[in-house]
């Protein structure tokens, strides 16, 4: 039999096995319709990207589930893919072109998009090669890209159908406008951070009176678009002003005072300027009161010469001249000029420092302007024409969760989902970009819209009119929302669609419940009548060791592949400090990295990383990544490797009980480990079925490290050396069979090391029924093998081992010294413990006696038994050792007592520290007492 390498080296082993699995086709579904199906959707990572810790976390969980259900015999499919990531990708390529002195407008749309495709082909493989490194057992033959031809057809089909059902429309709406990118962006792409700003108090005179109102604002530059000033309906101070007109400073216009529940009378001055064309809250207020929308800003976020006036239905209602002095100024420039003019006219009453949340584009850092733009929308609360269900898209998705068709794990996320779904707005699906699915709509010269699957189809609807195509592309989330069925052959009724829709579970982070999860439920339910998945397992976010969010700008991002392969300090610093949005932070990031990783990051291997991630997968809570834990699990891999080598050296070429007809005599130790294995099988299965990967990892770790390696393997050494043939055969059989099953149990979490070891162990356990551990059956517990009697005996034995070890410690007997043990007991069966005790407690012999010898030696209790170690002690040397130890303990006691008696310490220090100190004090007193007793005995 091939010998296992002396030491565990993950790198080569991982590459070798992954290549073998992929080439052998093990990742493909069996398509055996007599078996239950298990399907899982990968949240498609951005094609621009590289794997980050969040990916490694959620891919560990997804792969763990896929491997678990594959071993359970299910027809298993995990579809991989990447997302075209509209904005992110376009920005990356634009930056690269800028380095060459080019921009997209000079190149034109066709040349620019072909550049992106070129770049995508080059870099798109990074993420998939990294997924291979993490061990993802996805069916690579079904890999998709959200802009490939198949997906493009589905996107067009869905758009056309929604348009024909009256659910897609074009309108003028307020959107998050990134002037640097020149596009509307989604709420997800807006990051609001607290910044230092000002609150300006401005005087708005009441027309025909010497009264005035004081409006507090953080954005005086939008004053040009004000349509009203609002007060709270219950603000009795100002109710007499409702309906009166105010002079709008700097404009020569007048605007009314209105009452609206949006206003908080306790905040600021109680007066709020209403600018519906430049603020989302004001938009809703304006809509309630039927005001106009006055747009004062261009798409470049500069003040217009003429403000455009619109109705809430999008109709153009003329224009008004704005003060010429502000035309063409940026928001910041206009603010400065207007404040100076307000000051000069005596209308600026006060300027106060004020902290405010400033919305910025997460990719550009540009301040986001709410702007009125022409956009395409999907109606969320309207029933489609001819829809027999009588439900809107949103209503279908709400019902799917309320009825339990879709379940959230943990279920507290249902409230978050419902809250959002029940207040849902129409979905803005257009983006003013060049990279993405171009909207399949055409316009004639009069602006009439023709939607078609192809230009020819649109042309047929338009008669002979000349058409021009819509330039906007669809929001990236539009194509992502279709993934549950666009990857399975829809609109055709394919075997894949039949077998794998509805999929079993979606594994994702909480931050995209609305943007992706809800939209998949809406679209899949609307177009197929089915829900996309039964369960939504929401996991927490992986943060750095201090609990900070990992981000490029913080310089605390960790590449999972660097944990797998290791990385030296210099390239790590370079990686963390290049491409920063704020390059001035580079020295600070370099310093922090050097402090945290003075020698770089060691190689932990994939299995240790995966096990770390699994151990962190508690329900829904964010986790702080600790390298010590990864190190601990790398040691666990070593432990498993070395234990397997020991087992193989002791059983290879010997009788391991493969011949079932030969006699077997199992000891209580064998029965105990076999029973513990059954319990581990039950616990790990339950944990994986309920997405408790943390519990699965804990059970596997404790069983393999503590019970199998630390106890059973040690005790098996005694049984292999002593005992008759039937006993030795039973021990060898137990060693290999328990290990083989433990490797199967651990395979979903640690696929590589378990496969390598299983190939060696399985033949000796009569378990090599399949080519690969991946295809081996999942262990099924036999509860009849759990012996309460064997468990009780083992607990009694462990207690005795610990009691003897404590005695040795108390007597200062070093590990090199063996000593005889006397056991006072009436229970003759304790004699069975002696051979094991000799090995584990370092004894020369163990003797059962009716009464312990009359001696000054310390006595320990273990159950009903009394234990004594008989050691000739050098009294003078032992007394000197104890006196030295006594002095040390007394010094520590004095120091700790002084600390606790220090005035104010107990009252002011954190409670957990005080408790810790008190516990330590009690421990030291106990230790001192034991030393004194020993000294008395020696004297």
Swiss-Prot record:
An example Gene Ontology CC term for this record: cytosol
What GO molecular functions are on record for this protein?
aminoacyl-tRNA deacylase activity; ATP binding; valine-tRNA ligase activity
Keyword Kinase present in the record's keywords: the answer is: no
- The record lists ATP as bound by 552
**Where is the motif ('HIGH' region)?**
45-55
SUPFAM superfamilies, per the entry: Anticodon-binding domain of a subclass of class I aminoacyl-tRNA synthetases, Nucleotidylyl transferase, tRNA-binding arm, ValRS/IleRS/LeuRS editing domain
GO annotations under biological process? valyl-tRNA aminoacylation
Q: What is known of its domains?
A: ValRS has two distinct active sites: one for aminoacylation and one for editing. The misactivated threonine is translocated from the active site to the editing site. The C-terminal coiled-coil domain is crucial for aminoacylation activity.
HAMAP family in the cross-refs: Val_tRNA_synth_type1 (MF_02004)
Q: Which family does it belong to?
A: Belongs to the class-I aminoacyl-tRNA synthetase family. ValS type 1 subfamily.
Its name, as the record gives it, is Valine--tRNA ligase
Per the record, the gene is valS
